[in-house]
């Protein structure tokens, strides 16, 4: 059959998991390529600032260290092995026959027909419209595996419920058509029930009026399958009877033999590449490559100017590494030279003495860019180059997020009392004091005389509605009322609508025969009646004995060509026959359509180095690749020497507070990511027009397998082709595994000081963290030594007023201070009278004997309130009494109104310097202040003296795989493969069904 046109390519799905195939062998190391030079990628976004830690002590500025040796070039990862072919999906179950529709309304009952002969078995009805199952998630398209033996087709199972649509699978290469499974044998057809006995033909009555349409009859139950009768002789083909109800499914047929492998279908046209799918999970990490040969040392860079010395930053959580910028375009690679013969390894010579640095050569004119060389095999990893001069220190990092307050320290021991200070100058007279607290309630006074009754007050406002009262008890049931008088007969109602016709009732039992009537008179002769119905065919007689075989008759004339018979049911697949004898090698077939792209082969040995071609035009800069996933944080390197302190930059303006972000807990250290899958194919070039598919040729007889061809000799070396157009910048490759740590190189010559770098941009404002819980109080620390007095620092900007802190515990009572001198302030206004004080002690008795106690007098009337006397002059201050014990702290009184601000007093004399107190315990962290924006970078200081070379830092851990790059341009179309060997002959097909007579 002619294959239909290939449909459009589906969307690219998720890449499948790596196949369990074995790891491929590592190819031979190639020659080292020319070092590429690309523009520096953009700076990644800054990571989240870390938590502020305690300020460390400022160390003495050290000399700037030399730039450490560059890390070894990682070996190129091994190409991932092609995954095993995905398992062939099992053939979906055939949908069950659709449910039988409800029976239509029963028509008027016709005359009973004569029972027909058993007709020939009807054709198999069309497959019912079973619910089509949704396609499941497509598995990953792996490389085509060997065709397995086709399993026997099982019986059709029930159609399961449609699952949710899965994610679209990746569109793999079009696989070859697998062998067609054998069709399972159909179950036996259910036995058709025998027709019931015909009823007696009644006399044909006069044709009546057509009756009304009957109600739809109830759906009859499916009859039980009748017992299979003995097969009768085929009778005359009667009219097809109505289709009976579907019988129960037959028993499961025997599994068919494996089907013969189908012929290979024509290769469809290559579909357009689908969109780039989501990156799949990283494959397993390849084996660590061998250490490459030592590369040539790179050119010595110029030492950058030392940057400003940053203030001691607070140590916080390490911020997440910024996303790596896109890799610059790779430099053009020269054509590889011819590989020389491999020499025997020589003995390692002693390193020679370092020569004097040569004079700096003149700057040559830039050469024209060479043509794009073919990508050679990956070169071996170079050894560590000489360490370059130290680069300029980075700009000062952004302020970290305010950290959570530390744990509450333990209560410290109270400090020693300080020395008594020199009395200060007299303060100004303060404002009038607040009202004193009410004194204790005095004893009850004598009862006064009864007052006169006052006038009646005004009427009060109406009260609010009361709440509903509780529910009362249930009342007693009343007596039944007397029966009422019957009412008048109502008017007749309208006639109702005619009801629907009811279902026919069951047939009643036949009644007893009535008495015989009188014999009627003979009627007039009637007209000739209508012809009677055709009688029922008689029952088929028993089969007679077979007669003697007659003589063979003469051959009759050739009949007309019969109609083509219907396709017979596919027979069971026969067993595979033995391979036929080896035939002569067939002629070479015509070039077939290009086959699907095969899996990527192992990298071949490096070819001979071609002659350099003419320089091609410079290509345009490609678009930056997609940002890769952030790599894992490398292990911290050795601390370098501290640089000289630069001049402090001006303070930046305070920015608005940023939103408060939740500080996430540091995640667990991720496992080492495996090498990612190779990048997807690039954007397709201008596709040629696809010609119409030619007619499919008839499959020829399978020939014997041809002899194995000999390996051809090496072809002549091809001429160097013209320079190709510059390719687009490819995606950044996955980072290779870190190589072994190389030995530190020799010190390079000191370079000239570089120009000062550009002023950095102000960083983004950090996120203010939430204040943490108050920690427990720590143990008191040992008193530290008395430090030298610090220099007067610049006055800081006044901060915003913080929230009032919690009230502390009452302090110990201090020694009473000396009374100050009277200030020059004006006399304050007299205060209000205080509450009466407690009753004083009884005075001493005077001379004379005590008199007899008098009788208690009647209580006198309450006298008028006395006038308050003039305020006396303030007496001299008495000597300070001894300090009494600290009383218990009373309850906090209500906060009074804020008093007026008093006049500023004269500045007191400076007291003597007290001894330095003990170092206090660290208090709980205050609320986080809003961090200021990063100030502009200060001017670069002069280059410091060259410091000793620092130790090489430990190589960082492998970064995570980057996102897959954009799809590259399609590769050249592969040449048409030679015709393969002819396969063994297939098994003979099953015999077809006999045609119609």
From Swiss-Prot:
Principal localisation: secreted
Signal peptide, first to last residue: none
Modified residues (4-hydroxyproline): 15, 18, 20, 29, 32, 35, 49, 64, 70, 79, 85, 112, 115, 121, 129, 135, 156, 165, 168, 195, 198, 210, 216, 225, 231, 234, 249, 258, 261, 273, 282, 297, 303, 312, 318, 336, 345, 351, 357, 366, 369, 378, 387, 393, 405, 414, 423, 426, 444, 462, 468, 474, 480, 486, 492, 504, 513, 525, 531, 537, 546, 564, 579, 585, 606, 612, 615, 624, 630, 648, 657, 666, 678, 684, 693, 702, 705, 726, 735, 744, 753, 771, 780, 783, 789, 804, 810, 816, 824, 830, 850, 853, 856, 928, 931, 949, 964, 970, 985, 988, 991, 994, 997
Gene Ontology CC terms, in alphabetical order: extracellular matrix; extracellular space
MF term (GO), any: extracellular matrix structural constituent conferring tensile strength
Ranges of compositional bias, category Low complexity: 102-118, 135-153, 201-240, 360-386, 395-414, 456-483, 591-605, 618-645, 674-690, 719-728, 738-753, 883-897, 931-964
Listed GO biological process terms: extracellular matrix organization
Protein function: Type I collagen is a member of group I collagen (fibrillar forming collagen).
Subunit structure: Trimers of one alpha 2(I) and two alpha 1(I) chains.
Name of this chain's protein: Collagen alpha-1(I) chain
Species the sequence originates in: Neocnus comes
